[in-house]
C-alpha cells in the first residue's frame, strides 16, 4: 500500500530525529550517561531505521544528504 503525502512527511520528520540522535550520540551530547553498549545499540537501531526508510522507492524531492551522512557516521561509530 502506498504511503500518503502526510505519511511520507511524518516518516521524513522521524528520519530527521534519527539523524539528530545519531549525530548527538557520536558527538557526546546525548546519552553520555549511558554505557557504551547502550550508546552503540541506539546508534545501530537508528542507522537501521534510516536504511529501511531511505530504501523506500516512493520518495519525492526529499533531500537525503543528512540521512546518507548519518548512516555513514553511524556505521563508522564504535562506542567506547
Language model segments and positions:
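Beta-rich interaction/scaffold domains
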Residues: 2-80
